[in-house]
Curated annotation (Swiss-Prot):
A cellular component annotation (GO) from this entry: cytosol
Subunit structure as annotated in this protein's UniProt entry: Homodimer.
Organism: Staphylococcus aureus (strain N315)
Positions contributing to substrate binding: H28, H261, R356, S383, H460, D468, R519
Required cofactor(s): Mg(2+); Ca(2+); Mn(2+); Co(2+)
CDD domains found in the cross-reference section: TPP_PYR_DXS_TK_like, TPP_TK
Protein name, UniProt field: Transketolase
A Pfam family per the record: Transketolase_C_1
């Protein structure tokens, strides 16, 4: 039963959120004031999260998908002992632990970075997917070593975003029973009344996806909220609980209006609101000891007991299933097996394969040595070569399966991969055509902001796609991805560069990787293995030509590298000194020492030509004012791939002409 102390705690969370925003003179008080009861009920009665043991693997995950309500999350983290009160006073200030929207790895207790609406919801599907897969893989009768929930607090805006439709469809199809969404249904959006833009039947929508739907008519009724969460945890399939709330609850002049969504209440309205709560408006950032004690005696006590029981269970599990236990411990550590490279292929001279196919070969090898390797494609596995051969598909019936069928849901796939990476225990990946990377670009950006070990496979990387035409031929995508900070964008030139690219992807603990791969075949370059290994890791290196300072530099990535080598050989026949540089990863190259960069691209050599079947954006930094860029300023065309490539000037003859014109 709930009592007056519980109501005091709820109102304290509201007041803390208000004061946090007032001091910053910036923020969104409406959601915290309306949603505090459901958050309080969840945290004190259900959530297994221990601020004193934040890395406890079997903890429940809480995601504030409506990231603009961050003041509520920070207030919860404070009263539960995870965040100092001083940090609330520094909300949205330089160097604080309380940024405007929650940030993963910045504030303890934040599971994923949220703010762009819909993505938190979709990443939560990834969190629940990770739990389901790991449970299916490691749990044995009497030993549920993976057994936790993912709880989401979502807003109207989250459910309007297209990604929520993709993610909800996927979650329902896969019966992710450990996913519970609390929907803060307050009928107000930033611009005004919600019914001006949003009138769908939430119950019908989610039941059509295969979700359970529950309704709490009064968002201040702690008992009803508690009952709904309890019911949700006992049902098969994901559950959404629509909780009807009043935005800005307690504010006499702003409650129920968009005026309280994204602006401080102001001093006068704050005073009136505190009086409505029965709190002293003269006291700021005030938390009574009895509120702290509530969290100590409920949430923290429960979490400590849960972790203690889990540790004991894990010890017994290790005795009964020693090999599985070792694999589990390695998985949750995030580390790779020491022998993970043992099965990786070496591609010999004379091998001629598309980098997507060579990547597929690498994937088969990784799956044998990295048990935590898990992912799939957005309905293009046959083209992306991304499935693990002879492996079981992931499904609600076979959650231990390795191949995920994401369906044509690119954005949700990207967010789900991020969620899986943030969850831990997996090295996740997702795959689609490169031109469709635009569909999941915001997820790539969040992956980079969070610094996740996530891999994105993008195949069919250029106009060489051919017949499908300009809608399916990437042009501006490469420059767009390279512009994302903290993103490894690797476009390998052959099978061996592809192998090392995968090594980089798996080993990059705080940088996501985009692998950009060809449809067409590429010859293996005549470069020693150790040179390829070091060169790809450093982002650029010499693959052909003069070790001395050359007269000409040919710079390229991916499929154009072998073309540059052909041109270089002809130039050498004409007595010219040429060096060909493969530049698979600009991000890595820019992190190298000036000495290394100078050794690869000598500043004294001004006669430079860059060759890439994509937008020229970015290449001028490397070719300089005296150099030239053979690239594409328009869109592609529909015709056989070889003909399209020729028509756009990616021929040995054109390269020679451009070089000789310098």
């Amino acid at each position: 039963m709930f009592n007056e102390k519980d109501q005091l705690a709820v109102d304290t969370l509201r007041a803390l959120s208000i004061d946090t925003i007032e001091k910053a003179n910036s923020g969104h008080p409406g959601l915290p004031m309306g949603a505090a009861p459901m958050a309080y009920t969840l945290w004190t009665r259900h959530l297994n999260f221990n601020p004193q043991s934040k890395d406890y693997f079997n903890r429940d995950r809480f995601v504030l998908s409506a990231g603009h309500g961050s003041a509520l999350l920070y207030s919860l983290l404070h009263v539960s002992g995870s965040l100092e009160l001083e940090e609330l006073k520094q909300f949205r200030q330089w160097g604080s632990k309380t940024p405007g929207h929650p940030e993963y790895r910045h504030t303890d207790g934040v599971e994923v970075t949220t703010g762009p609406l819909g993505q938190g919801f979709a990443m939560s599907v990834g969190l629940a997917l990770a739990e389901d897969h790991l449970a299916g893989k490691f749990n044995k009768e009497g030993y549920n070593v993976v057994d936790h929930y993912t709880y989401v607090l979502a807003s109207d805006g989250d459910l309007m975003e297209g990604i929520s439709h993709e993610a909800a469809s996927f979650a329902g199809h896969n019966k992710l029973s450990k996913l519970v969404v609390l929907y803060d249904s307050n009928d107000i959006s930033l611009d005004g009344e919600l019914n001006k833009a949003f009138s769908e039947n939430t119950k019908a929508r989610f039941e059509a996806y295969g979700w359970n739907y529950l309704l709490v008519k009064d968002g201040n009724d702690l008992e009803e909220i508690d009952k709904a969460i309890t019911t949700a945890k006992s049902q098969e399939g994901p559950t959404i609980i629509e909780v009807k709330t009043t935005i800005g609850f307690g504010s006499p002049n702003k409650a129920g209006t968009n005026g309280v969504h994204g602006a401080p209440l102001g001093e006068v309205e704050r005073k009136l609101t505190f009086e409505n709560y029965g709190l002293d408006p003269e006291k700021r950032f005030n938390v009574s000891e009895e509120v702290y004690e509530i969290f100590q005696n409920t949430m923290l006590k429960r979490a400590n007991e849960d972790e203690s029981q889990w540790n004991s269970l894990l010890e017994k599990y290790a005795e009964t299933y020693p090999e599985l236990a070792e694999e589990f411990k390695l998985a949750i550590s995030g580390k790779l097996p020491k022998n993970y490279k043992d099965e990786l292929p070496r591609f010999e001279l004379g091998h001629n394969g598309a980098s997507r196919a060579d990547s597929g070969t690498v994937i088969q090898a990784i799956s044998k040595t990295v048990p935590s390797f898990f992912g799939g494609s957005a309905d293009l596995a046959g083209s992306n070569k991304s499935n693990v051969n002879d492996a079981t598909d992931y499904s609600s019936e076979t959650p231990e399966g390795k191949n995920v069928w994401f369906g044509v849901r690119e954005f949700a796939m990207g967010a789900a991969v991020n969620g899986m990476a943030a969850h831990g225990g997996l090295h996740p990946y997702g795959a689609t055509f490169f031109v469709f990377s635009d569909y999941l670009k915001p997820a790539l950006r969040l992956s980079s902001i969070m610094g996740l070990n996530a891999t994105f496979i993008f195949t069919h990387d250029s106009i060489a796609v051919g017949e499908d035409g300009p809608t399916h031929e990437p042009i501006e995508q490469l420059a767009g991805l390279r512009a994302i900070p903290n993103m490894n964008v690797i476009r390998p030139a052959d099978g061996n560069e592809t192998r090392v690219a995968w090594e980089v992807a798996l080993e990059s603990e705080s940088t996501p990787t985009s692998l950009v791969l060809t449809r067409q075949n590429l010859p293996v370059l005549d470069v020693p293995e150790d040179v390829v290994e070091e060169g790809v890791r450093k982002g650029a290196y010499t693959v052909y030509g003069s070790e001395e300072t050359p007269e000409f530099l040919l710079l390229a990535s991916g499929s154009e590298v072998s073309l540059a080598v052909e041109a270089a050989k002809d130039l050498e026949k004409q007595g010219k000194s040429v060096r060909v540089v493969s530049m698979p990863n600009w991000n890595a190259f820019e992190q190298q020492s000036e000495e290394y960069k100078e050794s690869v691209i000598p500043s004294s050599v001004t006669k430079r030509v860059a060759i890439e079947m994509a937008s020229p954006l970015g290449w001028h930094k490397y070719v300089g004012t005296a150099g030239k860029v053979i690239a594409i300023d328009g869109f592609g065309a529909s015709a056989p791939g070889d003909l399209v490539v020729e028509k756009y000037g990616f021929t040995k003859e054109n390269i020679l002409n451009q070089v000789m014109s310098l």
